[in-house]
Curated annotation (Swiss-Prot):
A motif (Cysteine switch) lies at residues 171-178. Keywords: Disulfide bond, EGF-like domain, Glycoprotein, Hydrolase, Membrane, Metal-binding, Metalloprotease, Protease, Signal, Transmembrane, Transmembrane helix, Zinc, Zymogen. A tripeptide motif (VGE) within disintegrin-like domain could be involved in the binding to egg integrin receptor and thus could mediate sperm/egg binding. The keyword Protease applies. It is an enzyme of class 3 (hydrolase). InterPro entries: ADAM_Cys-rich, Disintegrin_CS, Disintegrin_dom, Disintegrin_dom_sf, EGF-like_dom, MetalloPept_cat_dom_sf, Peptidase_M12B, Peptidase_M12B_N. Its cofactor is Zn(2+). It comes from Homo sapiens. Residues 197-681 are extracellular. Residues 703-722 are cytoplasmic. This is Disintegrin and metalloproteinase domain-containing protein 21. The gene is ADAM21. One of its GO terms (biological process) is single fertilization.
Amino acid sequence: MAVDGTLVYIRVTLLLLWLGVFLSISGYCQAGPSQHFTSPEVVIPLKVISRGRSAKAPGWLSYSLRFGGQKHVVHMRVKKLLVSRHLPVFTYTDDRALLEDQLFIPDDCYYHGYVEAAPESLVVFSACFGGFRGVLKISGLTYEIEPIRHSATFEHLVYKINSNETQFPAMRCGLTEKEVARQQLEFEEAENSALEPKSAGDWWTHAWFLELVVVVNHDFFIYSQSNISKVQEDVFLVVNIVDSMYKQLGTYIILIGIEIWNQGNVFPMTSIEQVLNDFSQWKQISLSQLQHDAAHMFIKNSLISILGLAYVAGICRPPIDCGVDNFQGDTWSLFANTVAHELGHTLGMQHDEEFCFCGERGCIMNTFRVPAEKFTNCSYADFMKTTLNQGSCLHNPPRLGEIFMLKRCGNGVVEREEQCDCGSVQQCEQDACCLLNCTLRPGAACAFGLCCKDCKFMPSGELCRQEVNECDLPEWCNGTSHQCPEDRYVQDGIPCSDSAYCYQKRCNNHDQHCREIFGKDAKSASQNCYKEINSQGNRFGHCGINGTTYLKCHISDVFCGRVQCENVRDIPLLQDHFTLQHTHINGVTCWGIDYHLRMNISDIGEVKDGTVCGPGKICIHKKCVSLSVLSHVCLPETCNMKGICNNKHHCHCGYGWSPPYCQHRGYGGSIDSGPASAKRGVFLPLIVIPSLSVLTFLFTVGLLMYLRQCSGPKETKAHSSG
């Protein structure tokens, strides 16, 4: 059971891969009377503090809500991939000039989860605008919750959504058979020649990422009280619900931009077919500044009886990667069903037929308008067929902070000729160094940087970047710049602790790697574990991934595949999607961790480059290679044995010697580090070079022997005299 509400990606076998992609237009059929609420109940969510065995993993929140005659405990956690961190919102001036603003969207106020003791429940909340707003689905019933504005006691209203099927009569699709045939004939030839079907072995991936742009027409804007902030809040709510519906397909729906037609519609709204056609042409030019996978238009038009329309399998194929969703003014959860349905068409899904099933009375791609939250086996098959053939734009997770960033004064990023950029008006009012026009205030020398303090350059020799480990090196300010020198570290291949070698600022070894995953008592497993597991070529043991194939490790490279551990005392608490494996080999229990295709998170189980794999050998790119492959232009002799080579092959001198070659007296550092401070005192090298270690050891042993010799005769004599 998904105890903590973790959404399980249902894997449905794709029975048939069709050649070509059928493209047509599919209308979400005509609506009947609008949905109605029951009378709302007033509830006050109370935070639940879990302790002991009932405590949730970090990141989970729990609230108790009493409605419908009983108490419900909601468990939820933050969604991280939903809205771009700097969301571009486009509106229009009175003279129809386009304005762009970038909202800073908090990444900790969109939640999803479940209701305790309610199997198949769903919770989708936002808390960005004061209180909880969203949807709860419990035992086949749907509820919407919203905060009571300005309530001093955190009061909310909970509405039960009527789900009587008589309110949802059969709906007619907007296409005739003749139109379907025409669309198929028009697009089939070009599509078949353009597509290159992918391997059937790649039909399941861990995650897809659909970057969505939403355009809101003027009637929708009027319905949202002609308030741009209210429009944004409504759009966020709908996308949040839709995203939760698509989790079962392993798909993230990520909002990357909104355009609001606040001054009137850009083109007429006469029929749903005309709106879709005009929208697909308009967006090709007007949304070109936003790289997106799909664009959907939210309209509100009671004169258009069709709820939605989209090009089937238009994903990744501009300009037909779009759809239109018609809000009927009923409930946001039902409108989210419409959006999920039309987005399903964009992703290649057809309407469900008699042999399609999802385990519920109503399914998302049903031709009947009923509350639904699941896709059928037919929808899975259509989705996988489309994404296999043309879903390349869905493969890569977006960098949410970099989706859209106009270069301009006021975006908080120093660009071009700007001296500084303090961001918004409110931020600039609190900035002592930077003005609103991106110039420095009078008397200020700087406004940011590791070597800027109180609008002044920090003095020469001031430490600005402390070394973080034995393979790192410090940097100091030069007194004339706000920037700390570029981060430098010890040259690759220089020995570090535990008979390891520094590599790219790290001192890696298998034992330490095992301790990081399994705790302080764990250690690297025997050679038999590495040979047996890493030669299998599966997600628990391999030497890399080529496309969709796990590569078996050659016998000489088994220590460079996946780390294998033993002496494991505790099972670690890991991120979602990781799986632990323990295998008994020759009386030893070998522990490892998996990594499968397109997890899109850091692989903590792969052996890190630079890890020792044999005498004088290290792992690089899953191969066990000789240390000689590393370029050692700089040697200890280069630094006169008084310093260490850095990653630029320059000498970083010990205290008492000056760069570049540590020949003359000075305060240490390198030509890259900035001038070292004269106040550091005695220099203690970060790297224990073996020769120095031996000298230290011999000195210590000699000293002990000397002391023992000095004290020995006295003890012997005293013992003899007794």
